[in-house]
Amino acid sequence: MFRGIVQGRGVIRSISKSEDSQRHGIAFPEGMFQLVDVDTVMLVNGCSLTVVRILGDMVYFDIDQALGTTTFDGLKEGDQVNLEIHPKFGEVVGRGGLTGNIKGTALVAAIEENDAGFSVLIDIPKGLAENLTVKDDIGIDGISLPITDMSDSIITLNYSRDLLASTNIASLAKDVKVNVEILNEW
């Protein structure tokens, strides 16, 4: 389990594509690069991936099975991604822990500023939304938060302003796709 708390923001510097897979080269933020090695398991935009190569200041991940259920196929060089390294054995994860098993993607419906930060309204596909309720935790691009409001398949999440500095949520806009992990599945 991961915490669902983004530890840093990486930048995609290279993407190599083949017929059914991709290799993404990501530049890590200072201080986080030293914490990974080949075979480190981590979240990249909420999806559990394994480091396959480190070359210079670049960390590489192979993406194959996740292409059909995530936003990776639409990412391009220069895009920012949320990063979280798997906690060490025995560390407490807490509420809203993520597995990195992305169930699908959703579209940002609207972004509204408020006193505490901003609210993001996300249109969750009906198949993913059917068991969700207000106060359930959900993972969006690797950030675990409780749902504060829900109307049909539109959920509302409230983000604080301090997340702008450490995550890629500043790049969210209407109709942008995000990765979704449902936490209350049985």
UniProtKB/Swiss-Prot annotation:
Record-linked Pfam families: Lum_binding
Record InterPro entries: ATP_synth_asu-like_sf (IPR023366), Lumazine-bd (IPR001783), Lumazine-bd_dom (IPR026017), Riboflavin_synthase-like_b-brl (IPR017938)
Keyword Repeat set for record: yes
Keyword Flavoprotein in record: no
PROSITE patterns: LUMAZINE_BIND
SUPFAM superfamilies noted in UniProt: Riboflavin synthase domain-like (SSF63380)
Stretches forming Lumazine-binding repeats: 1-96, 97-186
Alphabetical list of Gene3D superfamilies matching this protein: 2.40.30.20
UniProt keywords, alphabetically: Luminescence, Repeat
An example Gene Ontology biological process: bioluminescence
Cofactors: 6,7-dimethyl-8-(1-D-ribityl)lumazine
GO molecular function terms attached to this record: riboflavin synthase activity
Function in brief: Antenna protein that modulates the color of the bioluminescence emission of the luciferase. In the presence of LumP, luciferase emission is shifted to higher energy values (shorter wavelength).
Protein name as annotated: Lumazine protein
